[in-house]
Amino acid sequence: MTFKSGYLTVRETEIWNLRKLIPNQSEIARKLGISRQAVNFALISIEDKMERTFNETLDSNNLTPVTMNLVDGVMEAYSPAYQLPVIVSLSNINGLKVWYLYEGNCLRCNLERSCRRTLLDEADERGVDVADDERKMEPTKLALKVYSDDLKEKTILGS
């Protein structure tokens, strides 16, 4: 089951998208024509599902959590096996993605173009401006640019 098809219902996805733009539950409720309590209940369910998704990702990839931003769907983690920082993202356009932040051989990798396109789509969905010269950045650096704002609004785990 992937994030795209199985974790959030259509209504929950709609509420999650609005929450990124409108922090006030009452305003979200008015916009959707439902009660504030219904929005609150949905947000509790959304956060639970997203946290479970992140925890499953941590477990399946043997990662250690660092920070988690459930509003924007971004988690910072660490890979003890590869000794690398990792960004895990959830989005409508790309679903669940795991980005290992290493200085690799992106220019020689056959996935470089696909990674860059995915990151540029993420930037569009998240409203991140990417200048023309930045569009050609190595995917690792582009990932840091795309997710840097989301990682500032975070919950530090273990404190």
Feature-to-residue mapping (PLM):
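Helix-turn-helix/homeodomain-like alpha-helical modules used for DNA recognition
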Residues: 63-140
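Short Lys/Arg-enriched helix C-cap and helix-to-coil transition segments
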Residues: 50-66
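Short alpha-helical "packing" element that flanks the helix-turn-helix/winged-helix DNA-binding module
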Residues: 11-19
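Short, Lys/Arg-enriched anionic-surface-contact patches
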Residues: 1-10
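Helix-turn-helix DNA-binding helix
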Residues: 39-40, 46
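Non-catalytic terminal/accessory regions
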Residues: 130-159
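Short alpha-helical "recognition helix" segments of helix-turn-helix
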Residues: 26-35, 39
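Residue-level signal for the short linker/turn that defines the boundary of a DNA-recognition helix
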Residues: 22-24
